[in-house]
């Protein structure tokens, strides 16, 4: 399966301006029910800001979220997937770089953010489907279509 099969077409990526405060970024994450934002400067992607950045770079360091700018605590994009990458490749990037989120970039534009939870859920569903097919086959239901 390819990454483009997981990309949500109707979803727009939630972003925060590089000059915004951490407080503003956290408010944006809360109101949009996301745990990561793309940090932009004049529509150019500069990095990512996540709950992990908040915990380790702001709260653990006793910084004031209202006075701390996102640009001071954001993380660089160390890896990205393209829509035509396989899910296995995307999972490998997440594991190799010890990430929880992976930007999906198409033509230089972040079109979605995949979470490791989404990928593991997909893998779990595929394994469950395969297991059901195998059980049906072993149980004598030879008419059950085998997975492709």
Language-model segments: residues:
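Tandem CBS (Bateman) regulatory domains
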Residues: 1-12, 50-80, 86-95, 116-148
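The conserved cystathionine-beta-synthase
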Residues: 15-33, 40, 80-98, 105
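A glycine-centered beta-loop-beta connector
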Residues: 29-32, 37-53, 94, 102-119
